[in-house]
Amino acid sequence: MMKRMVVGSAFVLAAIGALSDSAQAQRRTSVGFAAGATFPVGDLGDATSTGFHILGTLAVSGSASLPIGFRVDGMYNNLSGKSSGPDVNVWTINGNLVYAFPGGTSVTPYIIGGAGWYNTKADESGAESSNDIGINVGVGARFALSGLSTFAEIRFHNVFSDPNSAQMIPLTFGILF
């Protein structure tokens, strides 16, 4: 548990350092919404089928001199139970660092990764929710349009739950204003 707190604290400090870049005036803040399919894997994939997710995001882009931005995502996932098993709902709040590859004009590929809080609950009477820490990593691309942009990304999420970790892969399509 202490190791997770140290890793989380280091992540937050790195994000704060990235946001205090002297070229902060070149940064852009965006609000966005997204949705897509969620593919459960591992033990979670044994119990549930492909589901869906919706996501809200607040993004601060990197600058020309430091192409590292920060993004806070809130996401809801619904995974259908297999056979007669219950559906599983996963709420997340993640802080992520985003490295945008330089040189992109209308299309900018990026790498994203971070950590956050995951609340998981089976949709059945008497089930208790579980609050856990998790991490995520993925790749995506941002597509600049007039006055807004769209994005597509795929990420791997690992939730450190007890007794087994839960993994899922959301494929996301969204819009940023």
Protein language model regions, located:
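Cleavable N-terminal export/targeting peptides
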Residues: M1-R28
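Intrinsic low-complexity/disordered segments
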Residues: D21-A23, T50, T150
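Transmembrane beta-strand segments of Gram-negative outer membrane beta-barrel proteins
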Residues: Q26-F39, I111
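Surface-exposed strand-loop-strand hairpins of Gram-negative outer-membrane beta-barrel proteins
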Residues: T38-L55, S130-N131
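A short acidic/glycine-rich loop-to-helix N-cap element
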Residues: L44-A47, S161-A166
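Gram-negative (and chloroplast) outer-membrane scaffold detector with strong preference
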Residues: F52-S125, D132-I135, F143-L148, E153-I154, ...
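A short, acidic, flexible beta-alpha connecting loop/helix-capping segment that sits on the rim
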Residues: R155-F160
